[in-house]
Amino acid sequence: MKNQFLEITDPIHDFIRLNSTEQKIIDTSVFQRLRRIKQLSGAHLTYPGAQHTRFEHSLGVMHIAGMAGTSLASKKQMPVTDIDDIRLAALLHDIGHGPFSHLFEEVLQKKKHITHEQIGKEIILKSEIGDIISKTTDKKKINRLAVGEGKKQFENEIISGALSADMMDYLLRDGYFTGAEHAKIDHNRITNSFEIYKNKLALQSSALVNFETMMISRFQMFKAVYFHKTVRAGEVMLLEAMSLADDHLGLSEMNAKEYVEQTDDTILEKLTSLPETNSELKAAKKIAIDYQNRKLFKCVFEKTISGKKSFGKNTLKQFRQDIAKKSKLAESQVFIDTTTTHSMPLAPSKKESNSIILIKKEGSKITPQIIPISEIPLVSTMSGKMNILRAYTQQKNRNKVEMAAKSILGEL
């Protein structure tokens, strides 16, 4: 049967073309659920336009991954037949995300140490999505590739890492919908400049400036959007409410079938409808209702911790206890947030990317060069971690907690 194509209009990529297998996958209820999971959790309370979801982001990642595959295939560096597999894996790279994306994952990790990648693998193998994939290719191969465990390293790097389709789409898309002007990325130039060297993804040296611009854009987006103090206030509230209500709602005990029925709205509805049978549930319900009505926690202390220093859970717990004691408040009224990310994207191995392979072409002569990211002038200034320590509380406790937090955290 002739493959039927469908074109979807997209504000980032103009048109995204889907083949029949891709169409069948996005039409499943499991995939359609991503329409109801916001890409940026609670950022819409600060940036009203940030209503975009994991659904359209997944389509965008598939599109850019296809561009990367087409570029490499045109240079005879990979078979044309592998492009569809890369696109499928990219389409499904976020299929395991739960409500409120990474926030729900934090709740799962506290008790079960489960990641959205692990859940995604189970969904691909055991749901109708796996059955659809099996009609055209190996679902186990797609499953591995979607979570960065494919046999060909360069294919993993197309989906996640310093040159990934995932990062290019989320920066472009998040910048567009938040209205932030930091996401300046020429993804066409970058993907057209892809090469393969020793089974790893490389970049033509002439596109180094585009890589630098992308890394700077990423750094700025973290500072201006992802780690914005008010964005984080909403996320701290969601995380606290879900953590307090976990035992009652069984959020971390859900099986795969229950998990894929959950969305941002279903979880928020459960939180705002909690019975007030104990202090934890009462607090969780109040926080959720305040979040829903945008009565957000107030940031009373903020400090950027430079370099590679970070704080463990026990240290953060001690900070919370000390500030509460000094403020003469219950510990439940003080919230410590530390936003930490590597300044460079993580490779598929989950380790920080520390080098990039540049390919210099002069006629028929090809010269590869492995450049430590620390030696790229514009990028090296951002090496280490972005680590921001903040203290939050309710409006009524603002002055007390501010004084205590400055006293305890000010000299760090």
Task: Walk through the language-model features, giving the residues of each.
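Histidine-centered, transition-metal-coordinating active-site segments
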Residues: 1-85, 97-412
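Short alpha-helical catalytic segment bearing the HExxH-like zincin motif
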Residues: 86-91
